[in-house]
Amino acid sequence: MKAFVLAESTDAQRALCAGARTIADEVVLAVVKGAPLTGVADKAYDVELPEGQPVENAAAGVQAAYEAAQPDVVLVEPTPRNKILAGLLAAKLGTAVVSDVTAFDGDTVTNMYFGGLAANKQKATGAKVYTVAGTAFAEAEATGSDDVETIAYVAPEKALVLRGTKAVPREGADLTKCDVVVG
């Protein structure tokens, strides 16, 4: 079995690749706009994105990396940009993204709904595309090679245009790393 990991942050790259190793024999990592970590996957794809382009415009590159890898399962770090890329990939594959996966048991996954108040077990039919936080996997270790391939940028037919950006200070805790949340 082969797993395809799409992640932005270095922590998520390491955690999701380690977790993917527990459910698959081969792990492939794809990163848009930033160098992929080495030593965490069997192969890594650096999906190019020109300066000033929004990440969403790299969807064709992510799809090219997916097609090159031919994976059985896709694990996606649940960031806003990656969720869009996952949705676009799933649409091309004729399937849907299963969000907020917390556990894997063979082909059955457990995911949260109602804002995490309830859990649901389901089995994907067709291509498997899941958003999952790195904390869903216990103390797994990431292993791999330094093999990195660059996927050239392909401009979309109808590209998003970035009109401006504004720095927003980072505040609050990362709830995916908390053991207990009281609220």
What are these regions (language model features)?
Residues 1-183:
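N-terminal glycine-rich FAD/FM-binding segment characteristic of electron-transfer flavoproteins
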